[in-house]
Amino acid sequence: AVKLQPNGGSVQTVTAPTTPKTVYVNMTTDCLYAKPGETVTPSVAYDGGWMHAYTYIDYNNDGKFTPKVNDNLSIEAGSDLVSFSFYGGNDNENGKNSAGTSISGSGRNTLVMPAFTIPADTKPGMYRMRYKVDWNSIDPAGSIDQSNPIIGNGGGIIAVMLNIHGAYANVND
């Protein structure tokens, strides 16, 4: 299951089927909701060990997720990667989460992703959103490292839709 919780709001959940076990699950018929400028916290439910969680939003609706991370492991402006629990560039080294908190040792075994803010200038509309569980990889398609590929490490990807809407909506009959 993947979740999104607006700051002070109710948790929204999309539950993916557990069988058959696949790396990619298309749940784009399910939708989560957020407003421009709203702070939200993503989360995943995962049974397994020593993995990390990543969330992406295709803000420019170009059909691909483009992660951009600075040398200090902070998320670059304009990145489709919006939150991650751990990234270190090297499997055996310390790293950070997307809030910039340094993580080392057994603390690297975390799926807890920091909250992020939907940019205030985001136009209302439908956006593809991707949740990924993987080991130390910001690649939105999953690690292809021969020593620990997503297909072999027990990770997975769930795709959903994100409905960005204003505080009010007009309903037409």
In which residue ranges do the predicted regions lie?
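A broad "non-catalytic interaction surface" signal
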Residues: 1-173
